[in-house]
């Protein structure tokens, strides 16, 4: 098995989470289990309660494509006001937090995750 494939398999087993924290807005967390079950905590709603294995696999592939494992664990984007909340994405055991919108690879994964669960 290739190293990238092993990492992708590990990420798929552990699932995903995304959310918002800090700032002056209520935090939330959305969790996508490896089996596709979607759970929500906080003031948001997910339009899907379960993703198919194909959808989970596509998210795992995207995480690999954006090289999620190489993103810095914490980024404070220049010019972002302190009262703006930070967002986070967890893939497997690795969590990345970003305050602002200065990392396009992170933003691409964030948007894919929110679209997959139909976050509102």
Predicted regions span which residues?
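Short, well-ordered, aromatic-rich surface patches in folded extracellular/luminal domains
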Residues: 6-21, 50, 55-57, 62, ...
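Short strand-coil-strand connectors
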Residues: 24-26, 41-43, 92-94
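Residue-level marker for the onset of beta-strands and adjacent loop->beta junctions
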Residues: 26-28, 85
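Solvent-exposed coil/turn segments that connect beta secondary-structure elements
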Residues: 21-23, 35
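Bacterial N-terminal signal peptides
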Residues: 1-3
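Short, flexible N-terminal segments of the mature chain
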Residues: 29-47
């Amino acid at each position: 098995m290739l190293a990238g494939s092993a990492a992708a398999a590990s990420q798929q087993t552990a699932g995903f989470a995304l959310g918002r924290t800090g700032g002056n807005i209520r935090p939330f967390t959305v969790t996508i289990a490896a089996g596709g079950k979607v759970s929500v905590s906080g003031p948001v709603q997910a339009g899907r309660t379960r993703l198919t294995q194909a959808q989970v696999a596509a998210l795992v592939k995207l995480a690999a494509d954006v090289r999620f494992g190489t993103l810095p664990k914490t980024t404070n984007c220049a010019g972002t006001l302190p009262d703006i909340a930070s967002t986070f994405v967890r893939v497997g055991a690795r969590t990345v937090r970003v305050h602002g919108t200065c990392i396009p690879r992170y933003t691409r994964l964030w948007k894919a995750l929110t679209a997959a669960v139909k976050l509102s």
